[in-house]
A protein has these predicted regions:
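Domain-level signature for soluble enzymes in the chorismate/prephenate branch of the shikimate pathway
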Residues: 1-90
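Hydrophobic anchor at the beta1->P-loop junction of P-loop NTPases
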Residues: 95
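P-loop (Walker A) phosphate-binding loop of NTP-binding proteins
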Residues: 98
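ATP-binding Walker
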Residues: 101
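Walker A/P-loop
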Residues: 104
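NTP-dependent small-molecule kinase module
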Residues: 109, 113, 227-261
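ATP-dependent small-molecule kinase phosphotransfer cores
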Residues: 120-170, 175-178, 206
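A glycine- and Lys/Arg-enriched "phosphate-lid" helix/loop adjacent to the NTP-binding pocket
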Residues: 183-226
């Protein structure tokens, strides 16, 4: 055996060690999730990720290949998050609510803590059409836009473990709600009209309220939609006075209770 073969054999032994360690680590991730659930502990603990990064930074101080090792550990953390997400949710999480209720914010937070894919319906539709939502409304009309929403929801039936952030009007169509529930749990995020106005006042891609950014108008439109929103929802979460972590922890907790019934 020449020197190159010896080195390659040593490399293969390293790979065996890494593989065994990864299998063990993934098993431990599942055990941690089970322990948290069994003992009623908080599922989301983002501070733990910060501790892991600090530990790695200290261990790699002054060593070669620091960036490459950091990339590997980032991949390991991402896959650990996905293992947690699949253990918690074997379905899509469908976020509905009035514009400005926090759907995009919560989608981003879930993506960060669980490495879940996010489908922002308005964003996807705008990208595919090559124009803003306002321009779609103006050029083709609301009916055309609503049909695009329905088709996208149908498309999502082939996927799972995805966060789907719906436009404010999406749940108003009964056929859309049917599609949401085929492979998802529907979470309604709510907020007071005053909160909604504060969140959307500087956004100009909201055609339904662009010329009516007032609390009374928003309150009236929210009331008109309330019954259908609530009928579509599996759970309802108020977002006023809560940060992203509190909202997502409540979301996870209540979905788990629902799944256990």
């Amino acid at each position: 055996m020449n020197q190159l073969e010896i080195l390659r054999e040593s490399l293969g032994q390293c790979d065996e060690i890494i593989l065994d360690a990864l299998i063990m680590r993934n098993r431990i991730v599942e055990d941690i999730m089970a322990y948290k659930e069994a003992n009623g502990l908080q599922i989301l603990q983002p501070e733990q990720e910060a501790k892991q990064k600090e530990w790695l930074e200290n261990r790699m101080e002054g060593r070669r290949h620091k960036d490459e090792v950091a990339d590997v550990f980032e991949c390991i953390r991402t896959n650990s998050k996905r293992i947690q997400a699949r253990k918690l949710f074997n379905y899509n999480i469908v976020l509905i609510g009035f514009m400005g209720a926090g759907k995009s914010t919560i989608s981003d937070f879930l993506k960060n803590v669980f490495a879940m894919d996010v489908v922002e319906m308005d964003q996807i539709i705008a990208q595919r059409q090559g124009m803003s939502i306002s321009d779609i409304f103006e050029t083709y009309g609301e009916q055309y836009f609503r049909d695009l929403e329905t088709n996208l929801l149908i498309e999502m039936q082939s996927r799972s473990n995805v966060v789907i952030s719906c436009g404010g009007g999406t749940p108003m169509r009964e056929c859309n709600v049917v599609e949401m529930k085929k492979n998802g749990r529907v979470v309604l995020l709510t907020a007071k009209p005053e909160t909604i106005l504060d969140r959307v006042k500087d956004n100009h891609d909201r055609p339904l309220i662009e010329n009516n950014k007032t609390v009374p108008f928003i309150a009236d439109l929210m009331e008109k939609r309330r019954a259908k929103y609530e009928a579509a929802a599996d759970i309802i979460i108020e977002t006023d006075g809560k940060n992203e972590l509190e909202i997502c922890e409540e979301l996870v907790h209540r979905l788990r209770i629902m799944d256990e019934k």
